[in-house]
Amino acid sequence: MEDFVRQCFNPMIVELAEKAMKEYGEDPKIETNKFAAICTHLEICFMYSDFHFIDERGESIIVESGDPNALLKHRFEIIEGRDRTMAWTVVNSICNTTGVEKPKLLPDLYDYKENRFIEIGVTRREVHIYYLEKANKIKSEKTHIHIFSFTGEEMATKADYTLDEESRARIKTRLFTIRQEMASRGLWDSFVSPREAKRQLKKDLKSQEPCAGLPTKVSHRTSPALKTLEPMWMDSNRTAALRASFLKCQKK
């Protein structure tokens, strides 16, 4: 699984996931399923944000190519992927600026158009079950929840899906691609089932051979959002990073 993750995801996402796990004392080489899950969640958060801007009239627009107008502002502030200290600094700054209620737990994004924090969920189970778990954990009606599954299902607070249908379709396609690529390498069952994961881990520890069939090249294309993980007060420099690129596993 570790080899698959390093081949399938952009190196910057992998690096952020490794830092996040090490911050909590977890080892990506051992807890490989969690490693894959964190990388997936990070990428979906970035895809959620990519190409969405607010114009001078306060309207939400999508810009997919070329350099956006200097008057445009990123619609979403990315909180996920930052270290905890910086993440809370960003959250506090948003709350002080907008007057929104400070969340008890770190959210993933902030939507400047709807003026709300967003919690993104990616699940291998039923979306409604995961949604309820998220809602029970957050315990706040102020934070908007949006859940995606690897089977193309989604669920959001009050059925408000925030993004346009095409943007959400890209996310669903990416998740389906990840699932198919895992399945083709015999990794999906262990990713879904904890019992199977333990069996797979024992098998991996016995074998030091590289995973057969993995692509030998890594895509170094970078999502626009990956280039914008600086403090929000540097927002004026963010627009230059816009490049149309969505990450996909390379074909075998």
Swiss-Prot record:
According to UniProt, where does the site described as Important for efficient shutoff activity lie? K202, K203, K206
Entry superkingdom:
Viruses
Question: Where, subcellularly, is it found?
Answer: Host cytoplasm; Host nucleus
Its UniProt domain note says: The probable endonuclease active site in the N-terminus and the basic amino acid cluster in the C-terminus are important for the shutoff activity. The C-terminus acts as a nuclear localization signal. The C-terminus is recruited to host protein complexes involved in nuclear Pol II RNA processing.
**Hey, which family's this protein in?**
Belongs to the influenza viruses PA-X family.
User: What is the role of this chain?
Assistant: Plays a major role in the shutoff of the host protein expression by cleaving mRNAs probably via an endonuclease activity. This host shutoff allows the virus to escape from the host antiviral response. Hijacks host RNA splicing machinery to selectively target host RNAs containing introns for destruction. This may explain the preferential degradation of RNAs that have undergone co- or post-transcriptional processing.
Designated name of the protein? Protein PA-X
Origin organism of this chain?
Influenza A virus (strain A/Swine/Hong Kong/81/1978 H3N2)
* Taxonomic lineage from the root: Viruses, Riboviria, Orthornavirae, Negarnaviricota, Polyploviricotina
Gene symbol of the encoding locus = PA
